[in-house]
Amino acid sequence: MPRSLKKGPFIDLHLLKKVEKAVESGDKKPIKTWSRRSTIFPNMIGLTIAVHNGRQHVPVFVSDEMVGHKLGEFAPTRTYRGHAADKKAKKR
């Protein structure tokens, strides 16, 4: 269920401060964050945000199609290596 419209979008204040500082200075260095729950705002477009996936920081370049989505959607947390192959089928 989506967030109520009367509440508005959520963003962590520490991340918002870092984004505003990067936009103001024109800095293109990735912004490191653990805040996967924060919504992507229009002032983040063009920035690279390194989102933590539980093991490492995944660089996410923010484009205009991403506005309104959460940062965590673009940093996968699980690695799928496929199911084990059937050994009997391999012999044939």
Curated annotation (Swiss-Prot):
One of its GO terms (cellular component) is cytoplasm. The keyword Secreted does not apply. InterPro entries: Ribosomal_uS19, Ribosomal_uS19_bac-type, Ribosomal_uS19_CS, Ribosomal_uS19_SF. Keywords: Ribonucleoprotein, Ribosomal protein, RNA-binding, rRNA-binding. GO terms for biological process: ribosomal small subunit assembly; translation. Pfam families: Ribosomal_S19 (PF00203). PROSITE patterns: RIBOSOMAL_S19 (PS00323). One of its GO terms (molecular function) is rRNA binding. NCBIfam families: rpsS_bact. Belongs to the universal ribosomal protein uS19 family. Protein S19 forms a complex with S13 that binds strongly to the 16S ribosomal RNA. This is Small ribosomal subunit protein uS19. It comes from Photorhabdus laumondii subsp. laumondii (strain DSM 15139 / CIP 105565 / TT01). The lineage of its organism: Bacteria, Pseudomonadati, Pseudomonadota, Gammaproteobacteria, Enterobacterales. The gene is rpsS.
